[in-house]
């Protein structure tokens, strides 16, 4: 039978999603876990690759497993075989023809940008020009097959953090990070709003800057033929882990801010 899982991970601890020899990747640790529950060769399909430093909340994978071993294909069993910073938290029995990659109707990414003085109205105006079907050549390292359709872009801010939600039928390499990089320059006044129209012209000789990977997260992937069952125990356990992690990172942020304050005192 075919099983689909929603998985999440903290990307700054991995060298990306895709398996690479000698490097710690999300695919490699997931493959090892699936091998141990009896998935042939640990093989699975995934909704999309994420680069080094990029996290996920709603990555989706699917795999085949013999029916007499399907009782092992549940989040809490698989999580016992995974590092604590990668976890499955929802499960669905998938139809025979389902593919986490090819059956996806849309994907949604969220980017968190610290920019307390950004002009949200300018950013939202520029973002509106990106919705629809365009050639995003200037928003990617790729130079072939660069036409994509963005369904929506929402931009909000809270306590100095600007949150970009971008939903599209599909993305090309670095597309979201370059969209954020371009919108940030517009928001801080280094570029006019109309600059986004220049970037949408594939003949423009310059591309958009790339925002750092750590602020990016794969939020969700949409399908028409799955009924997800969330694992309550996993969500409770992971919530405790994330609270501890958030406290640790908040404390480290305080350390860095104090270092910055003292260094600035010298000039």
From Swiss-Prot:
Reaction(s) this enzyme catalyzes, per UniProt: uridine(38/39/40) in tRNA = pseudouridine(38/39/40) in tRNA
Location of the active site: 51 (nucleophile)
> GO molecular function: any one?
tRNA pseudouridine(38-40) synthase activity
Recorded family membership: Belongs to the tRNA pseudouridine synthase TruA family.
- Role: Formation of pseudouridine at positions 38, 39 and 40 in the anticodon stem and loop of transfer RNAs.
Q: Which GO terms describe its biological process?
A: tRNA pseudouridine synthesis
For this protein, the Enzyme Commission number is 5.4.99.12
Q: Report the protein name in the record.
A: tRNA pseudouridine synthase A
Q: Name one Pfam family in it.
A: PseudoU_synth_1
Binding residue positions for substrate = 109
Keywords associated with the record? Isomerase, tRNA processing
